[in-house]
Amino acid sequence: MKELSLNGAVVQTYPLTAAQRIHFYTVSACRREELLNIATGFYIEFADVDFNTLRACIRDGYEKFESMRLRFTKDEDGNLVQYLVPTEDREIKLVDFSHWREEDAHEEMKRWSRIPLHMDGSPMSEIVMIRLPGNFNGLYMKVHHMTMDSTAIMSFYSYVLNLYCYKKFENIEAPKLPKSYLAQLKLDLKYEDNSPALERDRKFWLEQLEAPEPIYTPFSPRNRLLELREQTGNPNLRACYGTGDIEADIKVYELEDAPSKALIAFSKEYRIPVASILLLGLRTVFSHFSGNEKDVSVKNAVARRGTLLESQSGGTRIHFWPLRTVIEPETSFLDALKIVQAKENALLRHANYDPIRYMGETAAHYGCPQGTGYECTTLTYQPVSAASLKGRQLPDMNFKSMWYSNGVAMQLIYVTVMHRPTDNGFSFHFEYEKNSVSLDEIEKLYYYLCRAIFRGIEDPNRTIGEILDWM
């Protein structure tokens, strides 16, 4: 931690955390800063929104959420550091799209989403109040991923919306105040300073490298590992490149209401997290596309929001970890879920370790070519639904939420599963490199993912081998 003089003012600066370094490493590799934009919209069917009050609530949100006032700059040694500004005084404008076609309005906001936020002391967010056709009104928000992740964004929306309701309606409780980002940041930096917890986590991850080398399994019938083996003349290669042309888009599939409810009911009945079911579904598909390979790895996004301070302090906390399982074909679906869940729990206990450091340790240990890896995709499951933002406050109003593509991706395909605001069903978002991955590949991935999951849910005693045979 160092003091830095900026524009005549002395500010306290802090190093980047491991979670922030993941994003900085990625954007440094592709040199497209818009990669780290997260752009979302939240709109309520309510014609009489008081935008002056809403603007005041947004300003209050900026004041209360410290990570919304983060800035980045380089210190005298050339290292990127972070610091807080005391206030956020920028204009919060209102844009009226009410006379546009709604799809054109969303296209315009998608264009905004591809304008980068620069890490040069500039603001790391942009919020615009929006009027949409059909009396839908709300917010468009673009934030930098090194300041906020999806959990933090949902918390910010919740705070602003609940504060607005508290000010405008009767019998509404004031929102709970968020925790301090700086307090959690100092704990994270203390962990990284050769703490005993860090040593325990390092020991765990180095033990994972004692296993034989993993193998890349594909997300579609096109096996890119076999293609790379042929190109390099190395039939023993087990790792593959995970990116191509980085221009990206998002394809969304909506799981119908009945199967969504069946998945949630199964999760509750057997006390298996939805994330574990999704992970098993994905690894089963990857096994299918690789000739029923038993050894499958999926990269899992771990939120690291276990404590009250972690869950309510904003910021970006996601670490990405390989979830590797070896599942025999005679294993039942339910037992396979328990294997995945146990592996997930082990990762969670040691998720604070630096993923970038572990990537380097993995590459050095197995000798895989630079830029290659063993996981064909990353899964993010967002258990907090947009419906939870307004359930107690505005139960009788329709609303919609949007996730706008920033146009860039550093992975061939990235799977995000979230809950629909209308009925709490599941939306499957496939962010994909559109010049490297075909829509046919995505369609097959979604089709077989649903097939694998619901074959298992229908009869948890079915074996993985039987499910693979039916695929």
Where do the language-model regions lie?
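Acyl-thioester-dependent condensation/acyltransferase catalytic cores
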Residues: 58, 62-141, 147-151, 158, ...
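A short, small/polar-residue-rich loop/turn motif at beta-strand boundaries
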Residues: 2-11, 15, 47-63, 79-122, ...
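His-Asp-centered acyl/peptidyl-transfer active-site segments
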Residues: 9-10, 29-38, 66-68, 74, ...
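Extended, hydrophobic beta-loop-alpha segments that form or line the acyl/peptidyl-thioester binding
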Residues: 65, 69, 154-160, 294-301, ...
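Gly/Ser/Thr-rich phosphate-binding loops and adjoining beta-strand/alpha-helix segments
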Residues: 3-16, 33-53, 119-141, 229-307, ...
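Flexible, non-catalytic linker and terminal segments flanking ANL/adenylate-forming cores
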Residues: 1-15, 19, 206, 222-224, ...
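Active-site-proximal acidic secondary-structure segment that organizes catalysis
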Residues: 8-15, 19, 95, 125-183, ...
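Short amphipathic alpha-helices and their capping loops
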Residues: 1-31, 56-100, 180-248
